[in-house]
Amino acid sequence: MLDQRIKTNWLSLALPVFISLILLSWGIISKRKLLIIPGFILFGLSSAFFVIFQRLVYYKTFTLLFAAIGIFSFSWLLLFVFLAVIRKTTAWWALFVAAISGAVSLNFLISKQTLLTFIFSISLAIGIVFLLWGTRKRAIGLLIPGLLVSTIGAGVFFAWNDPVEKNGLQQTGTMLMWFALGWILIAVISKIFSRKFTWWPLIPGGVLTMVGAGLYIGGNPDNALGFFQNTGSIGLIMFGVYLILLKYGMKNK
């Protein structure tokens, strides 16, 4: 009624935002989890809805989507921070939502969005949260999905993102090599969290490496020399990282 009388065209949209801020303030002051969580969720949803449908400023649709989903992501990030500070609890589920929605929002800044860019950004976001969680808990069981999800997303993106490249064998080989990298990194990083080197991830990593290398070279034999030079350099770097981790593990014994 008031919105129709003063003809603001935004008051009705802003009302849920005001309600969420009141709910948030009440929850923060009282330190009640049952008010903080719905307060932040309502704030994120209502703010995103307001940004998309408001008529105060006019921007391109993709810009509005970036801002709306970005605010939604930021609200979940604030929820994660406030629960950690006020309630002394680490709500990793909130960080997952924040990271995934943030990754989606960033895609709307790209001039050309494709399914592959969404897959890459979302998988990278999920992987980073798992890696942070696993590092915080010092749990290899959380690092495994983090490394695998990240490298799988990267493999799909870098293998199939080039519209000019039409060599299916070579692209499949590239994808499998990225998959293999995830398993190999699990074996390398495991030295930080355990006193012994975890060998079993090298089995799927080695199989995927051989199959991927065979497909990559079979797709274009002219790339064989450059391929072995690059993989040799990467192998030396990973061996150096392993030696550093080995020394680090010995110091902690």
Task: Mark where each language-model region is.
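Alpha-helical transmembrane segments and their membrane-interface anchoring/capping motifs
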Residues: 1-253
